[in-house]
């Protein structure tokens, strides 16, 4: 009995070890590390020098203003992209009102007549608010 428990404990330990080991990132070998260092030093010589320029207060204010203008224009474009909905039919049922089958269609084009309790209680509901 103790031998089987010992074997099961060993098996569980190995399974845990292999599970953790399989999820760890693979480490680079020394040979790969040397080749990476030599490649990175050669590649760094290929790039041109970069100069860092400090911004003054006026340029910061201008960039903020430009960013605000861009944000406003993008909001306006997003609001303009909405497609105009067709006008509702003249005899129509408002949202959340009763719309039993002989009743006319729902006023909201995104709403549909949804019936519950075996068709005894029907109401106009908007199923997709992003319609």
From Swiss-Prot:
Residues 92-131 form the Agouti domain. It is found in: Secreted. This is Agouti-signaling protein. The gene is Asip. Glycans are attached at residue 39. Epithelial cells of the hair follicles and the epidermis. Keywords: Disulfide bond, Glycoprotein, Knottin, Secreted, Signal. GO terms for molecular function: melanocortin receptor binding; type 3 melanocortin receptor binding; type 4 melanocortin receptor binding. Involved in the regulation of melanogenesis. The binding of ASP to MC1R precludes alpha-MSH initiated signaling and thus blocks production of cAMP, leading to a down-regulation of eumelanogenesis (brown/black pigment) and thus increasing synthesis of pheomelanin (yellow/red pigment). Causes hair follicle melanocytes to synthesize phaeomelanin instead of black or brown pigment eumelanin and produces hairs with a subapical yellow band on an otherwise black or brown background when expressed during the mid-portion of hair growth. One of its GO terms (cellular component) is extracellular space. GO terms for biological process: adult feeding behavior; epigenetic programming in the zygotic pronuclei; epigenetic regulation of gene expression; generation of precursor metabolites and energy; hormone-mediated signaling pathway; melanin biosynthetic process; melanosome organization; melanosome transport. Residues 58-100 are annotated as: Disordered. SUPFAM superfamilies: Agouti-related protein (SSF57055). Residues 1-22 form the signal peptide. Residues 70-84 have a biased composition (Basic residues). Disulfide bonds join 92-107, 99-113, 106-124, 110-131, 115-122. SMART domains: Agouti. Pfam families: Agouti (PF05039). The presence of a 'disulfide through disulfide knot' structurally defines this protein as a knottin.
